């Protein structure tokens, strides 16, 4: 069974085409028009061992908010579609990722219920032209459309770039753990019989 998804989203603010492959590390190609987000999505895919292609045209003349949030929405939707009925998946993932002086923890539950908890003090308001406050909007869109509990906590650190980068790496690794198929799991990993 192929666990892949291609999602297209067209609004007055963004045009996004995203292809996700959960099991094959196809070449990672990301072009969002925002260099920092390109870097973060590439890290997410590399450390999660996902195939990922993303092409975005956004209203960057306004700012990076719509583009960043909509990418999170589409990425979450792609995970939901690629996972299908979630039969046999671990469901949970938890990872700690250090980056120099920073340590971040990410914990995921692919429960079918959306919830985001994000604890991170991002002291730099921008990185280049990227507004760091939209990182939370990205993860909210992702959690909502992946229908997942997403808990991200930067435990400590100084550098805002390192904090955000460790988030993307930690969530990528936690998602890899959560989507892994375990042959010992019969059906779905829930007493309800569905997730």
Swiss-Prot record:
<dbReference type="InterPro" id="IPR020565">
    <property type="entry name" value="ImidazoleglycerP_deHydtase_CS"/>
</dbReference>
<keyword id="KW-0028">Amino-acid biosynthesis</keyword>
<dbReference type="Pfam" id="PF00475">
    <property type="entry name" value="IGPD"/>
</dbReference>
<dbReference type="InterPro" id="IPR038494">
    <property type="entry name" value="IGPD_sf"/>
</dbReference>
<dbReference type="GO" id="GO:0005737">
    <property type="term" value="C:cytoplasm"/>
</dbReference>
<comment type="similarity">
    <text>Belongs to the imidazoleglycerol-phosphate dehydratase family.</text>
</comment>
<keyword id="KW-0963">Cytoplasm</keyword>
<dbReference type="GO" id="GO:0000105">
    <property type="term" value="P:L-histidine biosynthetic process"/>
</dbReference>
<keyword id="KW-0456">Lyase</keyword>
<dbReference type="InterPro" id="IPR000807">
    <property type="entry name" value="ImidazoleglycerolP_deHydtase"/>
</dbReference>
<protein>
    <recommendedName>
        <fullName>Imidazoleglycerol-phosphate dehydratase</fullName>
        <ecNumber>4.2.1.19</ecNumber>
    </recommendedName>
</protein>
<dbReference type="GO" id="GO:0004424">
    <property type="term" value="F:imidazoleglycerol-phosphate dehydratase activity"/>
</dbReference>
<dbReference type="InterPro" id="IPR020568">
    <property type="entry name" value="Ribosomal_Su5_D2-typ_SF"/>
</dbReference>
<keyword id="KW-0368">Histidine biosynthesis</keyword>
<comment type="pathway">
    <text>Amino-acid biosynthesis; L-histidine biosynthesis; L-histidine from 5-phospho-alpha-D-ribose 1-diphosphate: step 6/9.</text>
</comment>
């Amino acid at each position: 069974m192929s666990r892949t998804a291609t999602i297209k989203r067209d609004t007055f603010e963004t045009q996004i085409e995203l292809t996700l492959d959960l099991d094959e590390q196809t070449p990672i190609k990301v072009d969002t028009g925002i260099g920092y987000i390109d870097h973060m999505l590439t890290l997410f895919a590399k450390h999660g061992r996902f195939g990922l292609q993303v092409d975005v045209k956004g209203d960057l003349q306004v700012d990076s908010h719509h583009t960043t949030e909509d990418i999170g929405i589409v990425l979450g939707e792609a995970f939901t579609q690629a996972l299908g009925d979630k039969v046999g998946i671990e469901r949970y993932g938890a990872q700690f990722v250090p980056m120099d002086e920073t340590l971040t923890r990410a914990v995921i539950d692919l429960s079918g219920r959306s919830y985001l908890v994000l604890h991170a003090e991002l002291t730099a308001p921008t990185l280049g032209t990227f507004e760091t406050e939209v990182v939370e909007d990205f993860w909210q869109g992702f959690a909502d459309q992946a229908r997942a509990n997403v808990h991200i906590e930067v435990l400590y650190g100084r550098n805002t770039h390192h904090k955000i980068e460790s988030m993307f790496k930690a969530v990528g690794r936690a998602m890899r753990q959560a989507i892994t198929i375990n042959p010992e799991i019969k059906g779905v990993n829930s007493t309800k019989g569905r997730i």
